[in-house]
């Protein structure tokens, strides 16, 4: 796994802030239900809380790209496959529930026959909107954040617990609240498995499953009005389907892994072995980077010292060639001139060599772990590498010019003597 995720502190703070804002807003928005005049089984105003909390977290915290990784709206073959499952699984749950009602209660309740006073299209649109705003916050945003440090299964458990607390209903007693908690947790676990390995394309799948479940339950069961048997049947049916679907998915992936011998990362991108050594890998990467910087600086220092030695040898060889040029013309005055010039060359060479060595030593003694210091050291090293080469070229050209001038002067003197 690539370590391009958010830090552990921001990860924990994002989850905490999202949950606190969601719960606080759900309490504050309850009073607006009666103000807007919309019935709660059409659109629940408190469901806006996860959407608002997600937007606030995106604006407040950094690493926007990581936070928005679960909010992709593109379509793939896997998304189409999961969309079909998002329609089939609610149908299976409703069939199990209706069969249970017919077996244990002799009938199931149709709310439409007991006084729904709004068109079905209004209910459908309202439930699609509710599903979108809730799943935008919990699945497309929160689950994506949690999965940066956990695998999909455990991330679904964490998000499922938070979603169950958010959806808790204590109005009709403790037993009703317990079965409602089981229902919402199983509901969330199914959704977590449905959006697994979709690479951020979660909103279509989550919205379809959520809207299908709530829309069907409104017409077939009376849990909305506090019927204990209804919520019990719904909770147990959803839990059975959740266990069966997740278990079957794990078995299929296990068989595929054993038979094809594919890499576990290829088979399941966010698997159980991910995120185990995230902190260790990060520390190891930083240590390797620091040691490589130290080695590079040491090698550069050695290269600078060797370059200084080469420059010194080139200068000595250039100076040593000067007597042979001057001996061809005159033996007295040129030798005296060459001697003085050699002494000055050695003095200048000594100065340049000492300066280059000092620059190499300063590079070795500079802090190796700081990236900004390494950049400045590299500039100094490049400058020190350029100075000996430039000096060598300047000295060669100056020696040639002096030799040409001396030859011309000697020729003039010899011509004067001949005259």
UniProtKB/Swiss-Prot annotation:
It holds the Pfam family Rce1-like. Residues 273-419 are annotated as: Disordered. Residues 282-299, 323-336, 344-353, 383-419 have a biased composition (Basic and acidic residues). Its main location: membrane. Residues 372-382 have a biased composition (Acidic residues). Keywords: Cell membrane, Cell wall, Membrane, Secreted, Transmembrane, Transmembrane helix. GO terms for molecular function: endopeptidase activity. One of its GO terms (biological process) is CAAX-box protein maturation. The keyword Cell wall biogenesis/degradation does not apply. It comes from the Bacteria. The chain crosses the membrane at residues 9-29, 41-61, 84-104, 118-138, 153-173, 175-195, 202-222, 231-251. It is a multi-pass membrane protein. It is found in: Cell membrane; Secreted, Cell wall; Cell septum. C-terminal region not involved in glucosaminidase activity of the SagB-SpdC/LyrA complex. Belongs to the LyrA family. Interacts with N-acetylglucosaminidase SagB; interaction is direct and facilitates peptidoglycan processing. Interacts (via N-terminal region including transmembrane domains) with sensor protein kinase WalK (via N-terminal region including transmembrane domains). Interacts (via N-terminal region including transmembrane domains) with sensor protein kinase SaeS. Interacts with other histidine kinases, perhaps via their transmembrane domains. This is Lysostaphin resistance protein A. It comes from Staphylococcus aureus (strain COL). The lineage of its organism: Bacteria, Bacillati, Bacillota, Bacilli, Bacillales.
């Amino acid at each position: 796994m690539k370590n391009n995720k958010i830090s552990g502190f921001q990860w924990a703070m994002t989850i905490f802030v999202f949950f606190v804002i969601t719960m606080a807003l759900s309490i504050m928005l309850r009073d607006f239900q009666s103000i807007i005049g919309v019935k709660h089984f059409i659109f629940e105003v408190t469901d806006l809380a996860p959407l608002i909390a997600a937007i606030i977290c995106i604006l407040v915290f950094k690493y926007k790209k990581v936070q928005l990784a679960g909010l992709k709206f593109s379509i793939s073959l896997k998304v189409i496959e999961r969309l079909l499952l998002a329609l089939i699984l609610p149908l299976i749950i409703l069939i199990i529930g209706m069969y249970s009602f017919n077996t244990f209660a002799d009938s199931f309740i149709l709310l439409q026959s007991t006084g729904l006073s709004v068109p079905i299209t209004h209910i459908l649109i309202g439930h699609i909107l509710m599903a979108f705003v809730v799943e935008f916050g919990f699945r497309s945003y929160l689950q994506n954040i949690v999965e940066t440090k956990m695998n999909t299964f455990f991330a679904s458990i964490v998000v499922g617990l938070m979603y169950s607390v958010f959806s808790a209903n204590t109005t009709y007693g403790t037993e009703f609240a317990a079965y409602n908690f089981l229902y919402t947790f199983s509901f969330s676990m199914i959704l977590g498995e449905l959006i697994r390995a979709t690479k951020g394309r979660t909103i279509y799948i989550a919205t379809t499953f959520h809207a299908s479940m709530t829309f069907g339950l409104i017409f077939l069961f009376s849990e909305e009005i506090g019927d204990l048997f209804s919520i019990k049947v719904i909770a147990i049916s959803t839990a059975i389907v959740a266990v069966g679907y997740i278990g079957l998915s794990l078995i299929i992936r296990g068989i595929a892994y054993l038979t094809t011998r594919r890499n576990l990362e290829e088979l399941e991108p966010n698997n159980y072995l991910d995120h185990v050594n995230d902190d260790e890998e990060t520390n190891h990467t930083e240590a390797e980077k620091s040691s490589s910087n130290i080695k590079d600086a040491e090698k550069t220092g050695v290269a600078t010292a060797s370059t200084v030695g080469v420059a010194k040898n080139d200068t000595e060889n250039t100076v040593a060639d000067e007597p042979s040029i001057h001996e061809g013309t005159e033996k007295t005055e040129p030798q005296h001139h060459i001697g003085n010039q050699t002494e000055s060359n050695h003095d200048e060479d000594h100065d340049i060599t000492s300066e280059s060595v000092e620059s190499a030593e300063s590079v070795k003694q500079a802090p190796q772990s700081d990236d900004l210091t390494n950049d400045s050291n590299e500039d100094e090293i490049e400058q020190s590498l350029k100075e000996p080469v430039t000096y060598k070229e300047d000295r060669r050209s100056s020696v040639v010019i002096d030799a040409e001038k001396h030859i011309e002067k000697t020729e003039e003197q010899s011509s004067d003597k001949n005259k």
